[in-house]
Protein backbone atom coordinates (compact mmCIF):
# COMPACT_ATOMS: atom_id res chain seq x y z
CA UNK A 1 0.00 0.00 0.00
CA UNK A 2 1.22 3.50 -0.84
CA UNK A 3 1.69 5.24 2.51
CA UNK A 4 0.28 8.48 1.06
CA UNK A 5 -3.03 6.76 0.24
CA UNK A 6 -3.62 5.62 3.81
CA UNK A 7 -6.58 7.38 5.42
CA UNK A 8 -7.33 6.52 9.06
CA UNK A 9 -10.97 6.05 10.02
CA UNK A 10 -12.39 7.12 13.40
CA UNK A 11 -13.01 4.33 15.90
CA UNK A 12 -16.69 3.64 16.59
CA UNK A 13 -17.41 1.24 19.40
CA UNK A 14 -20.25 -1.26 19.16
CA UNK A 15 -23.36 -0.12 21.01
CA UNK A 16 -23.14 -3.05 23.39
CA UNK A 17 -19.48 -2.36 24.23
CA UNK A 18 -19.15 1.38 24.66
CA UNK A 19 -16.90 1.43 27.70
CA UNK A 20 -13.16 0.84 27.56
CA UNK A 21 -13.26 -1.75 30.35
CA UNK A 22 -16.03 -3.67 28.60
CA UNK A 23 -14.01 -3.72 25.38
CA UNK A 24 -10.88 -4.87 27.20
CA UNK A 25 -12.53 -7.72 29.09
CA UNK A 26 -14.76 -8.94 26.26
CA UNK A 27 -11.81 -8.99 23.86
CA UNK A 28 -9.91 -11.12 26.37
CA UNK A 29 -12.82 -13.57 26.60
CA UNK A 30 -14.40 -13.59 23.15
CA UNK A 31 -11.51 -13.02 20.76
CA UNK A 32 -10.75 -16.04 18.59
CA UNK A 33 -7.59 -17.98 19.39
CA UNK A 34 -7.22 -19.10 15.79
CA UNK A 35 -3.91 -18.27 14.24
CA UNK A 36 -1.27 -19.68 11.94
CA UNK A 37 0.85 -22.60 13.09
CA UNK A 38 4.14 -21.32 14.43
CA UNK A 39 7.64 -22.49 13.72
CA UNK A 40 9.84 -21.50 16.65
CA UNK A 41 13.38 -20.31 16.08
CA UNK A 42 15.77 -19.60 18.94
CA UNK A 43 18.43 -17.03 18.16
CA UNK A 44 21.46 -16.32 20.32
CA UNK A 45 21.92 -12.68 21.33
CA UNK A 46 25.26 -10.84 21.41
CA UNK A 47 25.24 -10.83 25.25
CA UNK A 48 24.95 -14.62 25.54
CA UNK A 49 21.19 -14.82 26.02
CA UNK A 50 18.49 -16.01 23.63
CA UNK A 51 15.33 -14.78 21.95
CA UNK A 52 12.50 -16.99 20.70
CA UNK A 53 10.96 -16.01 17.38
CA UNK A 54 7.70 -17.60 16.28
CA UNK A 55 7.30 -17.60 12.52
CA UNK A 56 3.91 -17.91 10.89
CA UNK A 57 3.37 -19.53 7.51
CA UNK A 58 5.16 -17.98 4.54
CA UNK A 59 2.60 -16.93 1.90
CA UNK A 60 5.14 -16.92 -0.95
CA UNK A 61 8.89 -16.94 -1.58
CA UNK A 62 9.00 -13.16 -1.91
CA UNK A 63 6.50 -12.18 0.80
CA UNK A 64 7.11 -9.02 2.81
CA UNK A 65 8.00 -9.73 6.45
CA UNK A 66 6.55 -8.05 9.54
CA UNK A 67 8.01 -8.41 13.03
CA UNK A 68 5.25 -8.33 15.66
CA UNK A 69 5.88 -7.08 19.22
CA UNK A 70 3.51 -7.99 22.06
CA UNK A 71 2.55 -5.90 25.07
CA UNK A 72 3.42 -6.09 28.75
CA UNK A 73 3.59 -9.72 29.91
CA UNK A 74 2.26 -10.91 26.58
CA UNK A 75 3.74 -13.44 24.17
CA UNK A 76 3.28 -14.84 20.70
CA UNK A 77 0.58 -17.15 22.08
CA UNK A 78 -1.75 -14.32 23.11
CA UNK A 79 -4.89 -14.15 21.05
CA UNK A 80 -4.34 -10.63 19.73
CA UNK A 81 -0.90 -11.64 18.45
CA UNK A 82 -2.21 -14.83 16.86
CA UNK A 83 -5.06 -12.85 15.28
CA UNK A 84 -2.78 -10.24 13.73
CA UNK A 85 -0.40 -12.94 12.48
CA UNK A 86 -3.35 -14.65 10.82
CA UNK A 87 -4.46 -11.41 9.15
CA UNK A 88 -0.94 -10.62 7.99
CA UNK A 89 -0.76 -14.03 6.33
CA UNK A 90 -4.12 -13.46 4.63
CA UNK A 91 -2.71 -10.20 3.22
CA UNK A 92 0.31 -12.02 1.82
CA UNK A 93 2.71 -10.99 4.59
CA UNK A 94 5.03 -13.34 6.48
CA UNK A 95 4.63 -12.70 10.23
CA UNK A 96 7.32 -13.29 12.82
CA UNK A 97 6.42 -12.70 16.46
CA UNK A 98 9.24 -11.72 18.80
CA UNK A 99 8.85 -12.92 22.38
CA UNK A 100 10.52 -10.48 24.74
CA UNK A 101 13.00 -11.99 27.18
CA UNK A 102 11.29 -14.29 29.65
CA UNK A 103 7.99 -14.25 27.74
CA UNK A 104 8.32 -17.34 25.55
CA UNK A 105 7.53 -19.83 28.31
CA UNK A 106 11.11 -20.25 29.47
CA UNK A 107 13.20 -17.93 31.69
CA UNK A 108 16.07 -16.28 29.87
CA UNK A 109 19.66 -16.83 30.97
CA UNK A 110 20.64 -13.32 32.01
CA UNK A 111 19.37 -11.20 34.93
CA UNK A 112 18.04 -8.54 32.57
CA UNK A 113 14.41 -8.33 31.48
CA UNK A 114 12.58 -6.32 28.86
CA UNK A 115 11.02 -2.90 29.44
CA UNK A 116 9.52 0.00 27.51
CA UNK A 117 12.89 1.64 26.89
CA UNK A 118 14.84 -1.49 25.95
CA UNK A 119 15.30 -1.52 22.19
CA UNK A 120 18.42 -3.63 21.66
CA UNK A 121 16.53 -6.91 21.17
CA UNK A 122 14.09 -5.75 18.44
CA UNK A 123 16.97 -3.86 16.84
CA UNK A 124 19.02 -7.07 16.80
CA UNK A 125 16.14 -9.04 15.25
CA UNK A 126 15.48 -6.42 12.57
CA UNK A 127 19.16 -6.37 11.65
CA UNK A 128 19.08 -10.17 11.47
CA UNK A 129 16.03 -10.10 9.20
CA UNK A 130 17.65 -7.54 6.91
CA UNK A 131 20.79 -9.67 6.63
CA UNK A 132 18.79 -12.79 5.80
CA UNK A 133 16.30 -11.15 3.46
CA UNK A 134 18.02 -8.12 1.88
CA UNK A 135 15.56 -7.86 -1.02
CA UNK A 136 12.27 -8.21 0.87
CA UNK A 137 10.22 -5.37 2.36
CA UNK A 138 10.43 -5.55 6.16
CA UNK A 139 8.02 -3.94 8.60
CA UNK A 140 7.35 -3.89 12.33
CA UNK A 141 4.15 -3.77 14.34
CA UNK A 142 3.93 -3.18 18.09
CA UNK A 143 1.03 -3.40 20.52
CA UNK A 144 0.89 -1.38 23.74
CA UNK A 145 4.30 -1.63 25.44
CA UNK A 146 5.62 -3.23 22.26
CA UNK A 147 4.50 -0.07 20.47
CA UNK A 148 6.46 2.02 22.97
CA UNK A 149 9.57 -0.02 22.29
CA UNK A 150 9.10 0.25 18.53
CA UNK A 151 8.56 4.02 18.52
CA UNK A 152 11.57 4.58 20.75
CA UNK A 153 13.68 2.47 18.41
CA UNK A 154 12.52 4.48 15.39
CA UNK A 155 13.56 7.70 17.14
CA UNK A 156 17.03 6.57 18.13
CA UNK A 157 19.74 8.43 16.25
CA UNK A 158 21.91 5.33 15.86
CA UNK A 159 19.12 3.33 14.20
CA UNK A 160 19.10 3.80 10.43
CA UNK A 161 15.38 3.49 9.76
CA UNK A 162 15.64 3.67 5.98
CA UNK A 163 18.07 0.76 5.86
CA UNK A 164 16.30 -1.47 8.40
CA UNK A 165 12.57 -0.84 7.92
CA UNK A 166 10.11 -0.16 5.15
CA UNK A 167 7.07 0.37 7.38
CA UNK A 168 6.06 0.51 11.04
CA UNK A 169 2.77 0.54 12.96
CA UNK A 170 2.20 1.14 16.69
CA UNK A 171 -1.19 0.27 18.22
CA UNK A 172 -2.69 1.39 21.56
CA UNK A 173 0.56 2.89 22.82
CA UNK A 174 0.71 4.31 26.38
CA UNK A 175 2.96 7.23 25.39
CA UNK A 176 3.10 8.69 28.90
CA UNK A 177 3.82 5.71 31.13
CA UNK A 178 3.82 7.72 34.36
CA UNK A 179 0.40 9.21 33.60
CA UNK A 180 -0.92 5.79 32.63
CA UNK A 181 0.31 4.26 35.87
CA UNK A 182 -1.32 7.02 37.90
CA UNK A 183 -4.57 6.53 36.02
CA UNK A 184 -4.55 2.81 36.80
CA UNK A 185 -4.36 3.61 40.51
CA UNK A 186 -7.43 5.87 40.42
CA UNK A 187 -10.07 3.19 39.86
CA UNK A 188 -10.74 -0.31 41.12
CA UNK A 189 -10.68 -1.64 37.56
CA UNK A 190 -7.32 -0.02 36.95
CA UNK A 191 -5.98 -1.57 40.12
CA UNK A 192 -7.33 -4.93 38.97
CA UNK A 193 -5.30 -4.64 35.76
CA UNK A 194 -2.21 -3.55 37.67
CA UNK A 195 -2.52 -6.47 40.10
CA UNK A 196 -2.78 -8.86 37.16
CA UNK A 197 0.49 -7.61 35.67
CA UNK A 198 2.22 -7.44 39.05
CA UNK A 199 1.37 -11.07 39.81
CA UNK A 200 2.96 -12.21 36.56
CA UNK A 201 6.07 -10.05 37.02
CA UNK A 202 6.60 -11.22 40.61
CA UNK A 203 6.41 -14.84 39.47
CA UNK A 204 9.21 -14.20 36.98
CA UNK A 205 11.36 -12.65 39.68
CA UNK A 206 10.81 -15.74 41.83
CA UNK A 207 11.97 -17.98 38.98
CA UNK A 208 15.24 -16.05 38.76
CA UNK A 209 16.08 -15.49 42.42
CA UNK A 210 19.47 -17.15 42.12
CA UNK A 211 20.46 -14.98 39.14
CA UNK A 212 19.17 -11.75 40.67
CA UNK A 213 20.44 -12.14 44.23
CA UNK A 214 23.95 -10.74 43.54
CA UNK A 215 22.35 -7.58 42.10
CA UNK A 216 19.15 -6.92 44.06
CA UNK A 217 17.12 -8.54 46.81
CA UNK A 218 14.61 -10.59 44.79
CA UNK A 219 12.61 -11.48 47.91
CA UNK A 220 11.69 -7.84 48.45
CA UNK A 221 10.36 -7.64 44.89
CA UNK A 222 8.20 -10.73 45.28
CA UNK A 223 6.43 -9.02 48.21
CA UNK A 224 5.58 -5.85 46.30
CA UNK A 225 1.98 -4.70 46.58
CA UNK A 226 -0.01 -1.92 44.98
CA UNK A 227 0.08 1.40 46.86
CA UNK A 228 -3.00 2.15 48.92
CA UNK A 229 -5.23 4.96 47.75
CA UNK A 230 -4.87 8.21 49.66
Model feature map: region roles:
Residues 26-57:
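N-terminal cap/lid segment of alpha/beta-hydrolase-fold proteins
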Residues 82, 96-116, 149, 182:
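Serine-hydrolase catalytic machinery in alpha/beta-hydrolase-like enzymes
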Residues 177-220:
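Alpha/beta hydrolase fold serine-hydrolase catalytic domain that processes acyl esters and thioesters
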Residues 103-139:
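Catalytic nucleophile-loop/oxyanion-hole region of alpha/beta-hydrolase
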Residues 222-228:
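Conserved small/polar residues in nucleotide/adenosyl-binding loops
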Residues 130-132, 137-184:
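Primarily recognizes the serine-hydrolase "nucleophile elbow" in alpha/beta-hydrolase
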Residues 59-100:
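Short, surface-exposed "cap/lid" segments of acyl-processing enzymes
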Residues 1-29:
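N-terminal presequences and immediately downstream first alpha-helices
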Amino acid sequence: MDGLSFKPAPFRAARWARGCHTQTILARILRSANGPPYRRERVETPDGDFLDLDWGSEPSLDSPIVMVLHGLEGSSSRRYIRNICRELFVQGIWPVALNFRGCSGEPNRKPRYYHSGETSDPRFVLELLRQRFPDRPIGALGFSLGGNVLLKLLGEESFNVREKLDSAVAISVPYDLAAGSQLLEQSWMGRFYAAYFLKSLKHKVQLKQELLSPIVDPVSYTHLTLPTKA
